[in-house]
């Protein structure tokens, strides 16, 4: 799908479905650098279908100003969330709808995510 052919209605209804971490990382990087361009290419980040992704480690690493709602992401296949929000200082959205039962590694997932409210991820052990 070429971004030049997308109209606003198409963009808002388009669901990006990355098949691997690199595709997802590329989309996240662009979203954090140029939201308008990313939205034209990938649609709204809150609508992305992440059900095929198994590794989200470092996904928002040092994305200091990232603070978008990704509570609807399907993370049920993810096994690695190490440092996922490490350095995402401003991130503070609910993640309570996430099914993290497959995750085996959450080390430093919210390291330096200083504004993150622990109540937004009741499944996470902050010890």
Predicted regions and their residues:
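Negatively charged
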Residues: 1-127
